[in-house]
């Protein structure tokens, strides 16, 4: 589970911590010496400041906290045989690709229907990566890296704003580029009101929550330069990635 908010607080820890323990125990029992752990940028927390791999993690959600603990569980496994075991921790931004049914699919659908507007601002920075680039990096790192602990932010560098992402989406797919920006105060009041009504009538409105609205307006300002500095290259630019994703996707599912 990774949708936040969306689950009970304890569910994030049950899933991510027990999952990490199970993986490490399996690796011990089967003499596995390489683990690639897909963490998240959530351990950095929701802050506007740029974050590098050296930044102090300050998670602001149960998901981010549980992922950070899971990283430490994997580090403990590696430390048992530091000269033999290889741990690669990846902190990807929003991952998009065929059948992901997530942020990019929802963005396309909203833009295609003319319902998308910029939430609060246009310059929100959003860390993203194409699934094919992420998979390629995993294979390359597994082959290249030596025993030890290796941490990488897996995001496009330089980072893109939500406006740049929307303009690229419009250019590649032919949907209309959004022009309207709705003030943050209006969105917060609207989300709070709808959630309040939902509680009164016992109904949940999927995707509408004050915390989620706030999340939309905060940058995920993640620095991906370490990848480049260590010789790794992404095969797709943002435009190429969206174009490839669009061609791979079932257009009926996107509408």
Region spans (language model):
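NAD(P)H-binding glycine-rich loop region in Rossmannoid oxidoreductase-like domains
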Residues: 1-18, 22, 44
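Conserved Rossmann-fold NAD(P)-dependent oxidoreductase catalytic core, especially the SDR/UDP-sugar
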Residues: 21-62, 88
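Active-site Tyr-X1-5-Lys
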Residues: 58-88
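Substrate-positioning beta->alpha
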Residues: 100-106, 120-143, 149-153
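Conserved C-terminal active-site "lid" loop/helix of NAD(P)H-dependent oxidoreductases
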Residues: 131, 167, 190-232
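Mid/C-terminal beta-alpha module of Rossmann-like enzyme folds, strongest
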Residues: 141-207, 243-246, 252-255
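Amphipathic terminal alpha-helices
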Residues: 222-229, 233-255
């Amino acid at each position: 589970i990774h949708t936040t908010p969306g689950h009970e607080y304890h569910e994030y820890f049950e899933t991510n911590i027990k999952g990490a323990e199970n993986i490490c125990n399996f690796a011990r029992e089967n003499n596995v010496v390489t683990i690639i752990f897909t963490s998240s940028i959530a351990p950095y927390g929701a802050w506007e400041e740029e974050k590098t791999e050296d930044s102090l993690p300050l998670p602001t959600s149960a998901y981010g906290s549980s992922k950070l603990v899971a990283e430490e569980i994997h580090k403990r496994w590696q430390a048992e045989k530091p000269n033999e075991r290889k741990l690669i921790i990846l902190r990807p931004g929003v991952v998009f690709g065929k059948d992901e049914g997530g942020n990019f699919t929802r963005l396309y659908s909203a833009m295609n229907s003319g319902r998308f507007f910029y939430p609060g601002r246009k310059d929100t920075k959003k860390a993203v990566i194409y699934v094919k680039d992420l998979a390629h990096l995993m294979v390359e790192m597994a082959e290249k890296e030596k025993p030890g602990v290796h941490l990488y932010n897996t995001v496009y560098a330089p980072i893109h704003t939500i406006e740049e992402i929307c303009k690229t989406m419009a250019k590649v797919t032919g949907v209309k580029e959004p022009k309207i920006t709705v003030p943050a105060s209006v969105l917060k009041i609207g989300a709070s009101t709808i959630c309040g009504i939902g509680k009164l009538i016992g109904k949940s409105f999927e995707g509408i929550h004050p915390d989620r609205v706030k999340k939309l307006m905060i940058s995920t300002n993640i620095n991906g330069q370490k990848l480049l500095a260590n010789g790794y290259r992404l095969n797709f630019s943002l435009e190429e990635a969206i174009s490839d994703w669009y061609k791979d996707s079932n257009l009926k599912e996107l509408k």
